[in-house]
Amino acid sequence: MADLSNLVEQLSSLTVLEAAELSKLLEEKWGVSAAAPVAVAAAPAAGAAAAPAEEQTEFTVILAKAGDKKINVIKEIRTITGLGLKEAKDLVEGAPKTVKEGVNKDEAEKIKKVLEEQGAAVEIK
């Protein structure tokens, strides 16, 4: 045990350059590398996401179907989008069409509620 204590004292007294040289000599002698092992991450399972998905912040409101009260839906579309009468009518009659893009969740829900009150079918994506 005295020899080990003596060895520890000798190693502790080495300079950084001497310690690096000792490390290289031991690597060559033992045929090993002092490089830190790199952990390989396991691949995610087939159905699992690699990282948690970010919560969506921008939504698109889509008019799926105008319903029976087309005139009321056209009026609401004009109010929501600022479109003219002809453009709003074309949007309603050409459903499914995008009403508004890049809106926050609250605004998308509000638009959906207003249009559904007029009998329209609305989707939020």
Curated annotation (Swiss-Prot):
GO biological process: translation
Disulfide bonds: none
SUPFAM superfamilies in the record: ClpS-like, Ribosomal protein L7/12, oligomerisation (N-terminal) domain
Keywords (A to Z) from UniProt: Ribonucleoprotein, Ribosomal protein
GO function terms (MF aspect): mRNA binding; structural constituent of ribosome
Gene Ontology cellular component annotations, sorted alphabetically: cytosolic large ribosomal subunit
Family: Belongs to the bacterial ribosomal protein bL12 family.
Assembly notes: Homodimer. Part of the ribosomal stalk of the 50S ribosomal subunit. Forms a multimeric L10(L12)X complex, where L10 forms an elongated spine to which 2 to 4 L12 dimers bind in a sequential fashion. Binds GTP-bound translation factors.
Role description: Forms part of the ribosomal stalk which helps the ribosome interact with GTP-bound translation factors. Is thus essential for accurate translation.
Annotated protein name in UniProt: Large ribosomal subunit protein bL12
